[in-house]
Amino acid sequence: MINGSIVALITPMNSDGSVDFASLERLVEFHIDQGTDAIVAVGTTGESATLPMNEHVTVVAQTVKFAAGRIPVIGGNGANATSEAIELTKSLSKVGVAAMLGVTPYYNKPTPKGLVAHYKAVAASTDIPQILYNVPGRTAVDMKPETVAELVAVSNIIGVKEATGDVSRVQRLRELCGNDFMLYSGDDATAREFLLLGGNGVISVANNIVPKAFKAMCDAALAGNAELAASIDEPLRGLYSTLFCEANPIPVKWAAHRMGLIECGHIRLPLTELSEQCHGLLLDAMTRAQIEVK
């Protein structure tokens, strides 16, 4: 099973909006070098909403190619039409991903019954492990632990990314879903507590720019060393909040560009590049986190 420090990888782009595959390869190498445990390709932070399906699949496939078996790659397969999610899942099943991460259908606000039916249909279209993804701040639907529990019996649904920031859900999910079901935090600010309460890993935005420190924090928390985890995590807390001064992934792409990790901080419309009033805030947070900028 995939656990530990997982990066929700940005998708680097050129100034004309095309995907910058040279920078993508460098990012993959960077995370392998820094000890990141796994990569999520083309999730929310990877701008899945603005990549058409053929491009989405290509980016995931290239990420797998660059990883070359050295780090697991999880492909984003969420969509708000079940038929589209199934089509995407079938395509991603051919490119070598270790698992897939499927966000709850957004905008159309399915009922719990609809969520269960959606995920069962998607899981039935592949043998590859599936991770559910609950982020109501983005989707306008909150998949409760009781709904997640209805999907545990599906053999290739292996876990859930819980991004509400409500750490009380860890215990409830564990009670309902059992010890073998993987619980991933999707909220950097509460990730340490999530792991200390029994979570298995974190799918992180900040991990794009502080992978070594984030990996060390996750390892300490998973080992039950709360004091060490806190000592690593506390200097990063300003970064966690500032990376959401505007909609993710606007700030983290700007930060990655300032670090020289990517050639350009371009982001696709309707998102726009980081506003000037946030530049100083983010630079200050990066300095406090001991991040070097170029």
Swiss-Prot record:
Keywords: Amino-acid biosynthesis, Cytoplasm, Diaminopimelate biosynthesis, Lyase, Lysine biosynthesis, Schiff base. CDD domains: DHDPS. Its EC number is 4.3.3.7. The keyword Cytoplasm applies. The active site is at Y133 (proton donor/acceptor), K161 (schiff-base intermediate with substrate). GO terms for biological process: diaminopimelate biosynthetic process; lysine biosynthetic process via diaminopimelate. SUPFAM superfamilies: Aldolase. One of its GO terms (molecular function) is 4-hydroxy-tetrahydrodipicolinate synthase activity. One of its GO terms (cellular component) is cytosol. Pyruvate binds at T45, I203. It is found in: Cytoplasm. InterPro entries: Aldolase_TIM (IPR013785), DapA (IPR005263), DapA-like (IPR002220), Schiff_base-form_aldolases_AS (IPR020625), Schiff_base-form_aldolases_CS (IPR020624). The keyword Glycoprotein does not apply. Pathway: Amino-acid biosynthesis; L-lysine biosynthesis via DAP pathway; (S)-tetrahydrodipicolinate from L-aspartate: step 3/4. The record marks T44, Y107 as: Part of a proton relay during catalysis. It catalyses: L-aspartate 4-semialdehyde + pyruvate = (2S,4S)-4-hydroxy-2,3,4,5-tetrahydrodipicolinate + H2O + H(+). Homotetramer; dimer of dimers. PANTHER family: 4-HYDROXY-2-OXOGLUTARATE ALDOLASE, MITOCHONDRIAL, DIHYDRODIPICOLINATE SYNTHASE. Belongs to the DapA family. Catalyzes the condensation of (S)-aspartate-beta-semialdehyde [(S)-ASA] and pyruvate to 4-hydroxy-tetrahydrodipicolinate (HTPA). This is 4-hydroxy-tetrahydrodipicolinate synthase. It comes from Shewanella sp. (strain ANA-3). The lineage of its organism: Bacteria, Pseudomonadati, Pseudomonadota, Gammaproteobacteria, Alteromonadales.
